[in-house]
């Protein structure tokens, strides 16, 4: 590609405010033909349309093409330089950070405190944002609303003691004036910092009011500061699952200095692990250049960096998504090699069992059962996700398919996350299967030693056909005679290792596995997150179920909530009241819950009010739930009422401080009521402070009030909070993402692309021949999480 010619051609068109461009015809077609061999799709697509665009948009497209050509030349130059450098194998970069000679002991301990253990971790610990401290604008040309650095001279200092801003510093750079505004209790002490005539550099968000340009509390630097004239990377740290800017300036600077030095000295040795054809397909920069440019960017748009849309971020994000998909597909490929028990399904028998049910199955339930039974009849292990909205009847699907497995002579293990849920499942399975001679047993941590001993004995001898339990099922003492089917409820609460340990109890055969999730996940995302599983979806509710009526109240409207609760109690119905865990300390949470419990007792003195909280032992929780079912009226709880808990008489769910929950969490809570043919209500209570219609939490809650479709709610939650919130895991932990974020629509769009590319690579190269560094990186990132040892 003759970049110099094309750049000159574009410059010529854009001269004199695009005078020649106004008269030119067929510019897009001409440039398309010149660039079609080398330019990425997004450039070519815009060139196809450019001739139809209005003049200003036409200019913008040509500037974008011009920018791409400059980057292309730069990358080519650096690419040639990299080609001459001897790259190291990737495992060299898995060495401990302590081995790096250019870092001081203090720098090493600071990096380790951020969770950086290896050289690889350090090189890929990218900044979360960038500050543009290049002095490339003036007061006149700087854009209002953007953060800018301006070199100015102090013109006047004003003290305004009784006003909102007590100190104002008027400055100029010759092109215009700007006022720096400060709010100090004692503004006189700040006078020394600003002397008339002194030169300073200010950095902050430029604002404007009635033609006056100003900044509030900007950073002030001396013109000789080493930070100036650069794009400054800003690093974050993860605290309690949240990403937060490293607030200490000293620590921020130490991290920045260490990572800049490390990336500058090592980037050229980092190997290109991706297949060449993929890099060419998307015109990606070399991964080594991404490391260099993201830690120490030179001539890149800061807006592009901060919106993660520059080419270097795009490459890293694509890589993360691609590696994750590759790991999932390899895991799926590996499981298919195992031998599973072949279940001979007696269809007539099963049809009779379905006809005997006291209710009719929905079409979606019938479809899910059919898909599962087809899988069970093969000797290839089933690995299926059963997804359904709250109350859609997943448990009955699990029970009926378990019956088919037991009738074929195999045992079933059902693992659930909590004791309360284990007891409930045990009751349901026992009730539904008692007429078929199926022995169902329960195994939880709270059984006595002799009860446990009896369960171990009967499971080993094969007398127990279905064993329901918590993670107690994966203990070494639990031995099955012939385990054929494993059902795991609420997948995300179990680690991969727990699932693996349960599946390993199959004695020579790999049991079929059904994962049930009551958390609806948009299908595209489900394929990506659970890409190693096949998916069955129950997308309709049983007939007769009424939609839960959801209403939003502010604290000042609480009386209406109490009125509704009183109405329902008079009808003989039951009420849940949920409080979020707000305090850092469990003691404070417990105190808050106890106070609320006492308050509800005073409000309803003639009613039986019970308290359930997370610190209670499981036995006590069970006792409270049983009491609530039998004779309780109101249950006040700090813990999210367990998913799957079934109290048909409960018709009201009051959720205090509802803005503190994610939408998917709220949807789970709402699903605890409306489990019969009675009208049910979900009443959300929020503080008056968030009344402002622009408040994001309020906007989210209004979406929630309008829809009861879990899949739509999940879509909304995904946009707002990312998939970690929906499936209950952090993106960095479960997915291994450092930069990719599925809450960003552009990253979600890339996810599907990465999935297709990973499928294509495995189709053509199932053992990843000649891609040693890619294999090693997969093992490093996903070896333990996804049992990918076979790739090595």
Swiss-Prot record:
Superkingdom in the source lineage: Bacteria
GO biological process, one term: DNA repair
Coiled-coil boundaries: none
Domain Helicase C-terminal, first and last residues per copy: 557-719
Region Wedge domain, residue ranges: 134-229
EC number: 5.6.2.4
Sequence positions that bind ATP: 388-395
Listed Pfam families: DEAD, Helicase_C, RecG_dom3_C, RecG_wedge
Top-rank EC class of the record's enzyme: isomerase
Motif stretch (DEAH box): 489-492
Reactions it catalyzes: Couples ATP hydrolysis with the unwinding of duplex DNA by translocating in the 3'-5' direction; ATP + H2O = ADP + phosphate + H(+)
Keyword DNA repair included in the entry's annotation: yes
Protein family (similarity comment): Belongs to the helicase family. RecG subfamily.
Function: Binds and unwinds Holliday junction (HJ) and partial replication fork DNA. Plays a critical role in recombination and DNA repair. Helps process Holliday junction intermediates to mature products by catalyzing branch migration. Has replication fork regression activity, unwinds stalled or blocked replication forks to make a HJ that can be resolved. Has a DNA unwinding activity characteristic of a DNA helicase with 3'-5' polarity.
Protein name as annotated: ATP-dependent DNA helicase RecG
Organism phylogeny: Bacteria, Pseudomonadati, Aquificota, Aquificia, Aquificales
């Amino acid at each position: 590609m003759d970049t110099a010619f094309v750049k000159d051609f574009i410059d010529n068109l854009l001269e004199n405010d695009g005078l020649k461009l106004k008269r030119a015809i067929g510019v897009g077609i001409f440039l398309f033909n010149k660039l079609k061999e080398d330019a990425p799709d997004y450039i070519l697509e815009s060139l196809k349309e450019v001739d139809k665009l209005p003049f200003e948009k036409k200019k913008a497209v040509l500037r974008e093409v011009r920018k791409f050509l400059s980057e292309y030349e730069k990358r080519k130059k650096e690419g040639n330089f990299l080609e001459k450098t001897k790259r190291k194998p990737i495992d060299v970069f898995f060495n401990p950070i302590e081995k790096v000679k250019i870092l001081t002991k203090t720098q090493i301990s600071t990096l380790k405190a951020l969770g950086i253990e290896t050289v690889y971790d350090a090189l890929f610990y990218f900044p979360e944002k960038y500050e543009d401290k290049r002095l490339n604008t003036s007061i006149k040309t700087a854009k209002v609303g953007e953060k800018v650095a301006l070199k100015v001279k102090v013109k006047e200092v004003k003290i305004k003691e009784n006003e909102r801003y007590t100190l104002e510093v008027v400055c100029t750079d010759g092109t215009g004036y700007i006022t720096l505004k400060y709010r100090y209790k004692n503004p006189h002490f700040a006078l020394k910092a600003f002397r008339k005539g002194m030169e300073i550099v200010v950095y902050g968000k430029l604002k404007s009011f009635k033609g006056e340009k100003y900044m509030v509390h900007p950073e002030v630097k001396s013109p000789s500061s080493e930070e100036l004239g650069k794009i400054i990377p800003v690093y974050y740290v993860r605290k309690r699952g949240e990403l937060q800017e490293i607030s200490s300036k000293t620590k921020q600077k130490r991290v920045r200095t260490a990572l800049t030095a490390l990336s500058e000295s090592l980037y050229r040795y980092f190997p290109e692990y991706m297949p060449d054809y993929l890099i060419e397909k998307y015109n990606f920069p070399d991964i080594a250049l991404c490391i260099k440019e993201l830690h120490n960017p030179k001539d890149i748009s800061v807006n592009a960096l901060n919106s993660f849309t520059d080419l270097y971020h795009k490459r890293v994000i694509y890589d993360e998504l691609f590696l994750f998909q590759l790991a999932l597909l390899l895991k799926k490929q590996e499981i298919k090699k195992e031998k599973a028990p072949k279940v001979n399904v007696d269809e007539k028998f099963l049809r009779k069992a379905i006809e005997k049910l006291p209710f009719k199955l929905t079409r979606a339930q019938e479809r899910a059962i059919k898909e599962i039974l087809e899988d069970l009849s093969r000797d290839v292990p089933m690995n299926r996700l059963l997804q359904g909205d709250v109350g859609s009847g997943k448990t009955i699907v699990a029970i009926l398919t378990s019956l088919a497995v037991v009738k074929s002579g195999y045992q079933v293990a059902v693992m659930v996350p909590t004791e309360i849920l284990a007891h409930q499942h045990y009751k349901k399975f026992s009730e539904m299967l008692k007429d078929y001679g199926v022995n169902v047993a329960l195994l939880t941590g709270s059984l006595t030693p002799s009860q446990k001993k009896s369960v171990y004995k009967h499971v080993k001898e094969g007398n127990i056909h279905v064993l329901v339990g918590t993670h107690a099922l994966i203990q070494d003492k639990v031995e099955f005679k012939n385990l054929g089917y494993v059902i795991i409820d609420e997948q995300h609460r179990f680690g991969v290792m727990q699932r693996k340990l349960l599946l390993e109890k199959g004695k020579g055969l790999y049991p079929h596995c059904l994962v049930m999730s009551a958390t609806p996940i948009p299908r595209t995302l489900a394929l990506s997150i659970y890409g190693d599983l096949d998916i069955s979806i129950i997308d309709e509710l049983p007939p007769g179920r009424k939609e839960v009526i959801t209403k939003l109240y502010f604290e000042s409207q609480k009386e209406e909530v109490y009125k509704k609760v009183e109405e329902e109690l008079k009808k003989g119905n039951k009420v849940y009241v949920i409080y979020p865990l707000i305090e850092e300390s469990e003691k404070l949470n417990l105190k808050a819950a106890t106070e609320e419990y006492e308050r509800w007792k005073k409000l309803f003195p003639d009613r039986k009010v019970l308290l359930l909280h997370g610190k209670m032992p499981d036995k006590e929780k069970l006792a409270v739930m049983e009491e609530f079912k039998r004779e309780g009226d109101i249950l006040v709880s700090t813990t999210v009422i367990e998913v799957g808990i079934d109290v048909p008489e409960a018709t009201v769910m009051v959720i205090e401080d509802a803005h503190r929950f994610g939408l998917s969490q709220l949807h789970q809570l709402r699903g605890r009521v409306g489990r019969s043919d009675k009208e049910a209500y979900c009443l959300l209570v929020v503080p008056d402070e968030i009344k402002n219609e622009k408040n994001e939490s309020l906007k989210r809650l209004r979406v929630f009030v309008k829809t009861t479709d879990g899949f739509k709610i999940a879509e909304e939650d995904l946009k707002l909070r990312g998939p970690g919130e929906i499936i209950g895991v952090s993106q960095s932990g479960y997915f291994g993402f450092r930069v990719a974020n599925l809450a960003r629509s552009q990253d979600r769009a890339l996810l599907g692309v990465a999935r297709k590319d990973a499928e294509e690579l495995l189709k053509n190269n199932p053992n990843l021949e000649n891609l040693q560094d890619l294999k090693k990186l997969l093992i490093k990132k996903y070896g333990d999480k996804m049992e990918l040892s076979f790739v090595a």
